[in-house]
Amino acid sequence: MPEQHLTRRDILAAVGSAAVIATAPNAVSPAHAADTEGGTVTTSDGVKLKHMAAGAGRPLVMIPGWSQTAAQFKYQIAGLAQTYRVVAVDMRGHGESQKVNHGYKISRLAKDVHDVLHKLDLHDVTLLGHSMGCSVIWCYWDMYGPERLSKLVLVDQMPFITANPTWSPDEKRDAGAILDAAALYDLYNRLTGPDAAKTTEGFVGGMATKAMPADQKNWIIQQNFKLPRRHAADLLYNHATQDWRDVIPRIKIPTLVVGGKASLVPWTSQVWISKQIKGSRLEVFEENEGGAHFMFMEAHDKFNRIVSEFIA
């Protein structure tokens, strides 16, 4: 498959082509749901974070992506809690966590994860991040190193979202950049403007394969709206301007890198990441098996098997 680079026009076309979203149904429940517990952790700056947990054994802590929720890991909670202690965290402002007006920066979210691991007294943790959750992990590593961690699972996040116009094609490919500065500001302004809902529907709706059922896609979009759009825009801007290419090669614990051939995140950037982390494992899902940005939902059985084998 040729390398994938989205232009500013591609991004704006996705944003502008949202389908009409009906009232979203409840989450499509996994066939065998685990007994899930709910809990609250208060961060060092007083914000109440909600989390879902199930199972017993070695801990697997999962960090959702930008504007995503812990509930979107429902298939992992159901499938992996039979073997592991699975914890999914709603980051500040996201999901069921407290809505506050500060802290929507990757560095603060990394500190929040650090707070969660300490408050729940978790050790030997496999830390899994999806999308922006990977950036949170990279920031955690930059600040705390391997503290309380044993393994990492990095799911579908490029090292740097926003391209420098002076980059060579190879630099752009390896970074995985899909925006330029003008497109980033345009997206920010749309998320803070009167068309914020339509913008979200188009942007997030374009992250799945065509095979994803409409009700599941609509539910994902409704989960996104749990983070107020102003905070979503602020966080996206901070996220999109972080360059992790100097941090990734310093990761020294076993790491699984997961990408998708049909994802908006260029799969070639996942190859670059895997090459920077010595001994890492790379898995790239094909489009016909649900290999877009939400492969952990669209191809949850295969995803869970790969993660379980990696942790074991």
Give, region by region, the residue ranges found by the protein language model.
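C-terminal segment of N-terminal export signals and the immediately downstream linker at the start
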Residues: 26-44
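Active-site loop/oxyanion-hole signature of alpha/beta-hydrolase fold enzymes
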Residues: 44, 52-54, 88-132, 136, ...
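N-terminal secretory signal peptides and thylakoid transit peptides that target proteins
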Residues: 2-18
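Flexible "cap/lid" loop of the alpha/beta hydrolase fold
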Residues: 138, 149-191
